[in-house]
């Protein structure tokens, strides 16, 4: 398994910020390795967050169960696993998760994966902090495809591990399996500040299915974020209209005519083939061009 040493240039001087152009360029540098990875597009990046930032994140990890924690004790589908919602964490943690849903991070992931138009999930469905304790596991699985709350397609998973020390004897490695579930093609130790990004579809099989053998009081902790795309089929359901204008009853005739023109243009843009709409616009501009030629 190959890894990359890369740190996002995150400025902590006034909140959390980064340059989206720089993060996209950084992702693009890693894109070829990501897209050619076996058994499906993925990458392992060590040192993804500045040390001061990830140290502070761990310091603010909620030690006690929160009211909205999602707890899994269902065997192969998740055992001794706890999901902590960012909304129940302190202000710094909330700010961090909001940053991870912002343009600089989305730009990095877009540059890395080649998937444009990525969208975050402000509700963190399935995401947030994850914690698994001794005896816990998560069976090999492919993730849900559609976010039912947002009606978006899940495309990319991003995980960052928060485990300062980790022994191979403790198990808990993230396993990536081939589509036929015949061979584990990659095994990733969940070590400190290691990030795993991978594309997700119906056959991106992954999990950590062996029971954790951590000492008492030691948990496997991670940050989990998921990114989505909208479907172009929305154009089959909703008219592709831009801003629609309406004149007021007492507006002058010229204003009413202008508003009708805007509205008519939008309906024509939605109804007509693009080449025909462009032709109509050229014809509309023709009288003005003729008048200018005569004046000159």
List PLM regions with ranges:
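N- or domain-start disorder-to-order transition segments that initiate the globular core
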Residues: 1-31
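A structural signal for the main folded, soluble domain(s) of proteins
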Residues: 77-83, 112-121, 130, 134-137, ...
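Eukaryotic charged/polar low-complexity linker/IDR segments
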Residues: 157-159
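Catalytic core of Fe(II)/2-oxoglutarate
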Residues: 5, 147-154, 164-296
């Amino acid at each position: 398994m190959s890894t990359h040493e890369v740190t996002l240039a995150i400025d902590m001087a006034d909140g959390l910020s980064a340059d989206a152009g720089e993060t996209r360029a950084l992702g693009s540098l890693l894109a070829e390795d990501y897209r050619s990875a076996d058994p499906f597009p993925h990458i392992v990046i060590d040192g993804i967050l500045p040390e001061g930032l990830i140290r502070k994140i761990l310091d603010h990890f909620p030690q006690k169960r929160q009211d909205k924690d999602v707890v899994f004790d269902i065997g192969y589908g998740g055992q001794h696993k706890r999901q902590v919602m960012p909304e129940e964490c302190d202000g710094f943690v909330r700010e961090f998760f909001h940053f991870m849903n912002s343009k600089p991070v989305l730009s990095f992931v877009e540059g890395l994966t080649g998937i444009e138009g990525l969208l975050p999930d402000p509700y963190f469905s399935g995401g947030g902090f994850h914690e698994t304790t001794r005896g816990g596991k998560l069976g090999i699985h492919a993730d849900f495809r559609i976010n039912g709350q947002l009606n978006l397609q899940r495309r990319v998973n991003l995980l960052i591990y928060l485990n300062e020390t980790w022994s191979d004897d403790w198990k808990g490695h993230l396993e990536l399996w081939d589509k036929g579930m015949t061979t584990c093609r990659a095994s990733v130790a969940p070590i400190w500040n290691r990030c795993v990004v991978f594309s997700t579809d119906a056959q991106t099989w992954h999990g950590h299915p062996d029971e954790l053998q951590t000492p008492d009081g030691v948990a496997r902790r991670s940050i989990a974020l998921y990114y989505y795309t909208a479907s172009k089929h929305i154009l089959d359901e909703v008219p592709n209209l831009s801003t629609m204008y309406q004149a007021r009853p007492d507006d002058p005739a010229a204003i009413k005519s202008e508003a009708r023109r805007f509205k008519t243009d939008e309906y024509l843009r939605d109804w007509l083939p693009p080449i025909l709409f462009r032709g109509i616009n050229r014809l509309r501009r023709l009288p003005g061009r003729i008048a200018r030629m005569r004046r000159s």
